C-alpha cells in the first residue's frame, strides 16, 4: 500500500518546538550551506539539527503538504512575535532532507547510490505530497547505482505498486538465494501479491530446469532430453547412470544457490566430470553437448514475474 501524505495538522502542531539547543545532549543547530538565504523566512530543521532556509514559494509549488500548511492562520504569542522566522522540526535526517530540498530547488543533489537514502527521500516525498519528486525517483529507481540490492528495490517498487519497475527488479533477484534467512526481513516488507509472484518465479525456474535435466520414462530415465540413448543401459561408462545422477544433482544444488543459472553458465559443473569428456559410448554425448543443452535450458526459463 502506498504511504499516505502526512497530515497538515500534525506538522502544524510541531511548528514551534522547544529550542533544540536547550535539549539534553543536543547538537547546536547549523545551516546547510546551500540554504542560508536570509530572504527565505521559513526555516526547516532536520532530526539531526541541520537547518534549511526555504522560500515559501518553493514549498508551495513543490509540496501539497506545505501548501496547505502555509495557508493556515498562524497562532501569534508575544514570544513568537519577536521572532523573525519560525523553525519547523521535521522527522527526517539531513541526509534525506538535504537531497530532497535540493531536488525541489533545482540544485545538484549528488549521487543517489545509497538505498537507505533513496528510500528515505521517496518516503519523505510521499509524506510531503511532492509528486514531481516521486515521479523523478520512480524513473531513477532502475537507473541509479542500487543494483547490488535488487531484492530491496523489488520490495520498494512493490510497496508503491510500480509494476514495470517491479518486473525489472524481479529479474535481478534471481542472483540471490532469497530462501535464506538473511533475506527474511526484506521479504516481510513485500506486499503479499508481489511476494507470491516472486516466490513462484524462483521456484518455477528450478522446477522447469530439473524437468529438462531428468525426464523419467516408462522404462528408464533420460538425461538432458537425450533421445538417442538413455545413458542408463548396463555397460555404459557410468553404470546405472551413477555419473549422470551425480552431475544432475550438482546442477540442482547450483540452481538453489543462484536460480539465474550463472554458475552453470560459467561451467562450474564440469568439476564433477573428473576429466571425462564422454559419458556414453553409444550416444557419444560429450561435455560440449551438455553445455549446449544447459545453456538452452536456462535461456528458455521464465525470467520475470
Where are these regions (language model features)?
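N-terminal BTB/POZ boundary and linker segment
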Residues: 1-59, 95, 102-116, 304
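Acidic, serine/threonine- and proline-rich low-complexity regulatory tracts
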Residues: 2-6, 136, 142, 146-305
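Alpha-helical oligomerization interface recognition
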Residues: 41-81, 129
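Short amphipathic alpha-helices and their capping/turn residues within compact interaction modules
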Residues: 71, 75, 105, 109, ...
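Alpha-helical oligomerization/assembly modules used to build nucleoprotein complexes
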Residues: 77-82, 115-116, 145-151
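Long, hydrophobic/aromatic-enriched structural stretches that serve as scaffold segments
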Residues: 82-139
Amino acid at each position: 500500500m502506498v504511504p499516505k501524505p502526512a497530515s497538515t495538522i500534525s506538522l502544524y502542531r510541531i511548528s514551534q518546538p522547544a529550542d533544540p539547543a536547550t535539549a539534553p545532549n543536543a547538537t547546536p543547530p547549523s545551516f546547510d550551506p546551500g540554504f542560508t538565504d536570509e530572504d527565505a523566512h521559513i526555516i526547516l530543521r532536520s532530526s539531526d539539527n541541520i537547518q534549511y532556509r526555504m522560500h515559501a514559494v518553493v514549498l508551495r509549488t513543490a509540496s501539497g503538504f506545505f501548501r496547505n500548511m502555509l495557508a493556515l492562520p498562524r497562532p501569534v504569542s508575544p514570544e513568537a512575535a519577536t521572532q523573525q522566522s519560525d523553525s519547523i522540526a521535521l522527522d527526517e535526517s539531513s541526509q534525506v532532507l538535504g537531497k530532497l530540498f535540493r531536488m525541489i530547488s533545482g540544485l545538484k543533489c549528488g549521487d543517489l547510490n545509497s538505498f537507505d537514502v533513496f528510500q528515505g527521500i521517496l518516503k519523505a516525498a510521499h509524506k510531503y505530497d511532492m509528486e514531481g519528486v516521486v515521479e523523478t525517483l520512480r524513473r531513477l529507481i532502475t537507473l541509479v547505482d542500487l543494483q547490488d540490492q535488487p531484492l530491496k528495490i523489488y520490495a520498494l517498487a512493490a510497496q508503491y505498486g510500480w509494476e514495470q519497475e517491479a518486473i525489472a527488479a524481479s529479474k535481478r533477484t534471481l542472483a540471490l538465494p532469497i530462501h535464506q534467512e538473511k533475506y527474511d526481513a526484506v521479504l516481510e516488507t513485500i506486499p503479499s501479491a508481489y511476494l507470491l509472484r516472486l516466490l513462484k518465479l524462483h521456484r518455477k525456474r528450478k522446477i522447469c530446469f530439473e524437468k529438462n535435466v531428468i525426464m523419467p520414462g516408462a522404462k528408464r530415465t533420460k538425461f538432458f532430453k537425450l533421445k538417442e540413448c538413455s545413458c542408463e543401459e548396463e555397460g555404459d561408462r557410468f553404470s546405472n547412470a551413477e555419473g549422470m545422477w551425480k552431475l544432475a544433482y550438482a546442477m540442482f544444488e547450483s540452481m538453489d544457490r543462484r536460480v539465474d543459472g550463472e554458475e552453470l553458465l560459467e561451467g562450474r559443473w564440469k568439476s564433477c566430470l573428473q576429466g571425462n569428456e564422454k559419458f556414453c559410448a553409444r550416444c557419444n554425448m560429450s561435455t560440449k553437448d551438455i553445455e549446449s543443452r544447459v545453456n538452452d535450458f536456462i535461456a528458455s526459463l521464465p525470467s520475470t514475474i
